[in-house]
């Protein structure tokens, strides 16, 4: 329930920045969550969550990582969401709705003991295995914490820059050669 969630317990302990019902659902124009105009519809829920969990939200004030919106948007799920696929996982699909808990809470949908079940929900990955569910979700390819993804990103950045630099050099050399041939032909 909301009262037992990270948001509910934070609000109960006096943290007024914690979201209450109106923070997610709106104050006067509450629409059913399945309708596209709702702030908590699959179409809008990631934007609603990013209000607090994004780079300009209140998350940093409480030591919560603020890259979650960006890493979601760069993930397979986030890219599919940008392409207007509304059946793809969003924040609430994995973290839950009213009963959002810290990852180390045994009742959390993203707890290591529960992640296979979370990924394996009908409509998501029903064949999910522990190996499948062990993959990193919020990956920042610019952070060394991302391990191999970081080094692959660096490799392709250097490869792309090197390829473009090489092409630029060949174009310049070709232009000089053509100019020299044109001068010799006169």
Regions found by a protein language model. Give the residues of each.
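Cytoplasmic C-terminal tails of single-pass
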Residues: 179-186
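Selective detector of the "anchor" transmembrane alpha-helix that sits immediately C-terminal
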Residues: 151-175
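Inter-heme linker and motif-flanking segments adjacent to c-type heme-binding CXXCH motifs
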Residues: 1-151
């Amino acid at each position: 329930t909301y009262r037992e969630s990270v948001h509910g317990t934070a609000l109960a302990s006096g943290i007024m920045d914690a979201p209450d019902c109106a923070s997610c659902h709106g104050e006067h124009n509450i629409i059913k969550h399945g309708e596209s105009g709702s702030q908590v519809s699959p179409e809008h829920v990631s934007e609603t969550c990013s209000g607090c969990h994004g780079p300009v939200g209140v998350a940093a004030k409480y030591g919560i990582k603020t890259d979650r919106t960006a890493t979601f948007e760069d993930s397979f799920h986030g890219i599919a969401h940008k392409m207007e696929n509304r059946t793809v996982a969003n924040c609430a699909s994995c973290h839950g709705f009213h009963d959002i808990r810290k990852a180390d809470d045994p009742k959390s949908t993203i707890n290591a003991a529960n992640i296979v079940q979370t990924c394996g929900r009908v409509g998501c990955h029903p064949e999910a295995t522990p190996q499948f569910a062990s993959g990193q979700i919020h990956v920042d390819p610019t952070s060394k914490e991302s391990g191999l993804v970081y080094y692959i990103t660096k490799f392709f950045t250097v490869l792309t820059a090197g390829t473009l630099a090489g092409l630029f050099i060949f174009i310049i050399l070709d232009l000089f050669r053509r100019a020299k041939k044109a001068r010799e032909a006169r």
